[in-house]
């Protein structure tokens, strides 16, 4: 992603364009699926994902000027770099937007989220969200247990969730770690 301060809703490709493979996102702890948003109420794949990952709570949120109270303030808050102490799970039922996430070198990667895309950002990962130029997304928000959506704006490197995330990022599964 480029470093331009231009409209946050634009794609912000680097020049020349650079596309990040899903394997790279997986290395950062991001999980994603492509599901059928037109039949989400009866989607067996969604049910299996929710059961396997313990996503017991869900709601649906329309993000657009006409439907979201205090729209401008909320969009500004979504785009402030932050982390959560729990996973952030979003399933795009309509519309589109971007999650910007930090890689291991603290560089931004822009992840497009479109209709049918479900994404899980790990706890402790710095990120931000913005709509694209369509200015609309209808998203299912999923949580383990009661919903907690507390953003910790950067810097909050002292939080256990951040330390655990960095440990996983720097010491991938299968790599030897020092005994304590």
UniProtKB/Swiss-Prot annotation:
Keyword vocabulary terms for this entry: Amino-acid biosynthesis, Cytoplasm, Dioxygenase, Iron, Metal-binding, Methionine biosynthesis, Nickel, Nucleus, Oxidoreductase
Chain residues that bind Fe(2+): 82, 84, 88, 127
Species classification: Eukaryota, Viridiplantae, Streptophyta, Embryophyta, Tracheophyta
Entry function: Catalyzes 2 different reactions between oxygen and the acireductone 1,2-dihydroxy-3-keto-5-methylthiopentene (DHK-MTPene) depending upon the metal bound in the active site. Fe-containing acireductone dioxygenase (Fe-ARD) produces formate and 2-keto-4-methylthiobutyrate (KMTB), the alpha-ketoacid precursor of methionine in the methionine recycle pathway. Ni-containing acireductone dioxygenase (Ni-ARD) produces methylthiopropionate, carbon monoxide and formate, and does not lie on the methionine recycle pathway.
Keyword Zinc recorded: no
Protein name, per record: Acireductone dioxygenase 1
Catalytic activity: 1,2-dihydroxy-5-(methylsulfanyl)pent-1-en-3-one + O2 = 4-methylsulfanyl-2-oxobutanoate + formate + 2 H(+); 1,2-dihydroxy-5-(methylsulfanyl)pent-1-en-3-one + O2 = 3-(methylsulfanyl)propanoate + CO + formate + 2 H(+)
Keyword Magnesium: no
Gene source species: Sorghum bicolor (Sorghum)
Cofactor(s) required for function per UniProt: Fe(2+); Ni(2+)
Entries under SUPFAM superfamilies matching the protein: RmlC-like cupins
């Amino acid at each position: 992603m480029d470093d331009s301060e231009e409209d946050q809703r634009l794609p912000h490709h680097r020049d020349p364009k650079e596309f990040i493979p899903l394997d790279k996102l997986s290395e950062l702890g991001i999980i994603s699926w492509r599901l059928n948003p037109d039949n989400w109420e009866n989607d067996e794949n969604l049910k299996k994902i929710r059961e396997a990952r313990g996503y017991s709570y869900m709601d649906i949120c329309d993000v657009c000027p006409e439907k979201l109270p205090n729209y401008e303030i909320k969009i500004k808050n979504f785009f402030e770099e932050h982390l959560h102490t729990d996973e952030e799970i979003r399933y795009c039922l309509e519309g589109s937007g971007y999650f910007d996430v930090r890689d291991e070198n603290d560089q931004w990667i822009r992840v497009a989220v479109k209709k049918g895309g479900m994404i899980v950002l790990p706890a402790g990962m710095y990120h931000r969200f913005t709509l694209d130029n369509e200015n609309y997304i209808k998203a299912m928000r999923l949580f383990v247990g009661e919903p907690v959506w507390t953003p910790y704006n950067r810097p909050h490197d002292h939080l256990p969730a951040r330390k655990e995330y960095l440990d996983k990022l720097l010491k991938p599964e299968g790599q030897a770690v020092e005994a304590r």
